[in-house]
């Protein structure tokens, strides 16, 4: 059917009271960003719902984008007709017939903001219900949990009909909770952490530590591809790559093997603290899950968090690996994450890292390296890229083959 509008219903915005307008404005901006390449669209974000006027654009493609926008509870493709009951009958019958299968039931739900229209909501329900019963053989009325809900909205600019409700992504509009910085490795966990933070309204920027020649260009491209996948939920993301080679080499040379990982992570956290403050962020996010590996014990977290006063948020902290993998599969990051390109966290990993490092020793071993100079040179080499949904950074088959040779 040729839809004319998509009606969007908000998610958790109803809980925000006097801040509701700000949340709706943020959602409107995010929707416009997600639909930027549909030039004929018009987006009207009103208090109760959002109306997206299609003006001839492809409804299916638009709805595919809307499914990924946080802050949307659900939405319905709609058809506008003139304020004439014969036109309403014709369109409603066609809508119901398109969905009807033997044994199905229906009900009608009418809202009327144009109180000058000649019929009230009960009259519209009765008249339209009678027409559907007369023209759709075998259909029955059911007021509770029907198969088809025909929604009718009588507005000043016409009557809008819809019979399909599509679930949105839920959550809060990206940006309403402030800016966060994600430590994005090439693994399974950190993209899931980023997704979960974005779902709670965080404007997430992606920070990746890059250690050439120990890590390959394919590993960097893989991280950018993960960022592009996550950008589908916000419209675009900033990707920040930090050179980490010199830091890793000096740590390996001067720090005992058991504390290599701890001191390395302390330097990463120092750099994250600096970048987050430069970018006016409010928190650091990572994909640590309690007790999975040596860097993720509580003793390790104490030793690593020691270098920052910013909140370090871990959205997957209590999840099992199977739970994390399930989300990664759902958001299309899993297949990318398991591609065989090593990141900087694995290339210098010692065979037996300390699972319960001591804070005083961590500080003492870190003093053996030139923290100030190393950080200054790393920050001077930072590169930033704006990444949009659908951008291709990784020619999967060719790059995997080349890496394995």
From Swiss-Prot:
Keyword Plastid: no
InterPro entries with a match to the protein in the record: Rossmann-like_a/b/a_fold, ThiI_AANH, ThiI_fer, ThiI_N, THUMP_dom, THUMP_ThiI, tRNA_STrfase, tRNA_sulfurtransferase_ThiI
Gene Ontology terms: cellular component: cytosol
Catalytic activity annotation: [ThiI sulfur-carrier protein]-S-sulfanyl-L-cysteine + a uridine in tRNA + 2 reduced [2Fe-2S]-[ferredoxin] + ATP + H(+) = [ThiI sulfur-carrier protein]-L-cysteine + a 4-thiouridine in tRNA + 2 oxidized [2Fe-2S]-[ferredoxin] + AMP + diphosphate; [ThiS sulfur-carrier protein]-C-terminal Gly-Gly-AMP + S-sulfanyl-L-cysteinyl-[cysteine desulfurase] + AH2 = [ThiS sulfur-carrier protein]-C-terminal-Gly-aminoethanethioate + L-cysteinyl-[cysteine desulfurase] + A + AMP + 2 H(+)
Entry's localization field: Cytoplasm
Pathway(s): Cofactor biosynthesis; thiamine diphosphate biosynthesis
The THUMP domain, residue ranges: 60-165
Zinc-finger in keyword set: no
Record family assignment: Belongs to the ThiI family.
Protein known as: Probable tRNA sulfurtransferase
Classification lineage: Bacteria, Bacillati, Bacillota, Bacilli, Lactobacillales
Gene behind the chain: thiI
């Amino acid at each position: 059917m040729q839809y004319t509008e998509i009606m969007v219903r908000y998610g958790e915005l109803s809980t925000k009271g006097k801040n509701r307008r700000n949340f709706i404005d943020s959602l409107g901006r995010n929707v416009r960003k997600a639909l930027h390449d549909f030039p004929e669209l018009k987006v009207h974000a009103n208090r109760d719902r959002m109306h997206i006027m299609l003006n001839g654009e492809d409804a299916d493609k638009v709805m595919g984008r809307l499914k990924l926008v946080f802050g949307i509870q659900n939405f319905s493709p709609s058809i506008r007709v003139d304020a004439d009951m014969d036109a309403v009958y014709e369109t409603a019958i066609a809508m119901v017939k398109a969905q009807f299968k033997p044994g199905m039931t229906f009900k009608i739900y009418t809202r009327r903001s144009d109180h000058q229209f000649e019929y009230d909501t009960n009259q519209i329900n009765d008249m339209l219900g009678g027409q559907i019963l007369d023209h759709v053989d075998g259909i029955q009325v059911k007021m509770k949990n029907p198969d088809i809900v025909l929604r009718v909205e009588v507005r000043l600019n016409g009557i809008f009909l819809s019979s399909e409700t599509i679930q949105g992504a839920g959550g809060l509009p990206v940006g309403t909770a402030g800016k966060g910085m994600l430590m994005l490795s090439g693994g399974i966990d950190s993209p899931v952490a980023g997704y979960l933070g974005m779902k709670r309204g965080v404007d997430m920027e992606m920070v990746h530590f890059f250690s050439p020649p120990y890590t390959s260009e394919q590993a960097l491209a893989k991280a950018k591809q993960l960022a592009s996948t996550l950008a589908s939920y916000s419209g675009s993301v900033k990707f920040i790559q930090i050179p980490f080679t010199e830091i890793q080499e000096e740590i390996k040379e001067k720090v005992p093997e058991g504390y290599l990982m701890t001191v390395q992570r302390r330097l990463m956290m120092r750099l994250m603290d600096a970048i987050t403050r430069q970018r006016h962020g409010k928190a650091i996010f990572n994909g640590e899950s309690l007790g999975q590996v040596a860097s993720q014990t509580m003793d390790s977290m104490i030793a690593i968090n020691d270098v920052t006063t910013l909140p370090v948020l871990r959205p997957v902290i209590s999840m099992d690996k199977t739970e994390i993998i399930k989300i990664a599969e759902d958001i299309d990051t899993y297949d990318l994450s398991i591609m065989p390109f090593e990141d900087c966290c694995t290339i210098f990993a010692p065979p037996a890292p300390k699972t319960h490092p001591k804070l005083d020793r961590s500080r003492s071993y870190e003093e053996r390296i030139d923290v100030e100079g190393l950080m200054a040179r790393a920050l001077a080499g930072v590169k930033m890229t704006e990444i949009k949904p659908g951008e291709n950074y990784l020619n999967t088959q060719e790059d995997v083959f080349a890496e394995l040779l």
